[in-house]
């Protein structure tokens, strides 16, 4: 979703008065390991980086967005979930299944085999690739 403030305002409009909003979304720490390594490798080989991972909202920004949309008494919590994959292809397959690939509207340079090979080496620890998914939960009342 590229326009979160508008989404929240629309949700507030369609919700019944005094109803509870409960929503979950991936937070700013999601895929941080992958994102850092991708950026470092692309800068090294291409002199710049393409947007490959959707920008995620951090917990502080989530609170501000909820309040700016007019919801009241927000409670926001986050939990980091660590997921292990056996290789980079399995990770990419799961991301595709979650709808988290090619979700940026801007065009990026395709990943080259050289980059993916080095990326897998940098991310692999004890024959596993560990990634973090931050799950942010928001509850707030519509006045």
Q: Where do the language-model regions lie?
A:
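Catalytic P-loop NTPase motifs of RecA-like helicase/translocase cores
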Residues: 1-2, 29
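A short glycine-rich, Lys/Arg-flanked "PGG" loop and its adjoining helix->strand segment in the class I
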Residues: 5-20
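Short, glycine/charged-enriched secondary-structure capping and boundary segments
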Residues: 6-9, 36-39, 89-90
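Conserved catalytic/acceptor-binding region of the Class I
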Residues: 18, 22-86, 102-105
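Conserved Class I S-adenosyl-L-methionine
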Residues: 75-143
